[in-house]
Amino acid sequence: LPDPVYAEVGWPRPFAHIAAAVAAGGPAARFAKEQARLWEDIAGQVPDGGRALIVSHGLFVELGAVASLPDADHAAWGEAIGYCEGIRLVYDSDGRGGTLLRLPEENRLIEN
């Protein structure tokens, strides 16, 4: 993760904070858009009906998710993604959608 992105956003931070940083148009926005493009490129290589798994870590996931779903209610997504959590993105003829994948609260772990 480039230092200017981490300096602008920090981690762990709630999705609302991350979305505000992306909206500001600085280093976090550029990185988020690059991440979203990369994920979309990977999805474009998957055959119809297929799936891909992308494994990443803190802040990469949040930034890419915000940029992939810019019209979502990011504040409703809550806190940062923890270990073994993520987002399921769907790219199809109807557009793009996503669902956060969370562990039960008692099993969540977020450390930096």
Regions found by a protein language model. Name each.
Residues L1-L38:
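Phosphate-handling substructures
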Residues A19-V22, A43-V46, S68, A72:
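Short, well-ordered alpha-helical segments in soluble proteins
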Residues A24-P27, L59-L63:
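N-terminal start-of-chain detector that recognizes signal peptides
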Residues Q35-D48:
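A short, acidic, amphipathic alpha-helical segment used as a generic capping/interface helix at domain edges
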Residues V46-S56, F60:
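Beta-strand elements within well-structured catalytic alpha/beta cores of enzymes
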